[in-house]
Amino acid sequence: MTGDEALIDLEAVTRVYATGEVEVRALDGVSLRIASGEFVAVMGPSGSGKSTLMNILGCLDRPTGGRYMLAGREVSRLRKGELADVRSRTLGFVFQNFNLLPRTSALENVELPLMYQGVRARERHTRASEALDRVGLAPRSGHHPNQLSGGQQQRVAIARALVTRPRVILADEPTGNLDSRTSLEVMALFQELGGQGITIILVTHEPEVAQFASRVVVVKDGRVRSDERRAPRIVDLDALGAPGNDAAPAGGPS
């Protein structure tokens, strides 16, 4: 990979936390380069530094030392307001617990990031509708989270991440609350998005999930211990059926 190909470029990144007189090196000289369209799984035991790494990649935290280049821009020394702008325009986030507003429809949940950007109502509606269609949930755009299954809620969360047209999606244990079939549907969607040029960075502790990525980075004691590219397992969509067909919760609309 050449420098021109690297969408993400970490060089000797450290993150040190001070607790009284004790210093904890959560990251210790991490160097990592990721290209557009790569699907990367980040693995490691509890306390390994993988969450700190994701926070820095997501511009939620700044490194103590080293350099972080994102889309050709050095973001490691940006101020909080500048980091927030990078997050809203370049990055999308997907979380284990979905983080949907319970009294708000799927469409309105997806519109939220655009509201923060000041996008006008008509364009918000159009882009949110397109994002829901992209994840196979256009027919359920008016449903509230409690009327959706776990898999459907996670697809709403992915649509919300996509609506700002990010170059990178950061997913933190996105299948942790899903059954095995629904987890496969989410992995299929991530593989599809990677094929469209969106970079996917996925934190997981499950090897069964990591096998769908084309690259697996293992972090331990704040360092990258291994970085392996391999042929990913491809989800058989025909065997799963069309997206959006998982059942709604009991009592919810079908």
Where are the regions a protein language model picked out?
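ABC family nucleotide-binding domain
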Residues: 5-224
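Conserved beta-strand-loop-alpha-helix hinge in the C-terminal portion
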Residues: 223-250
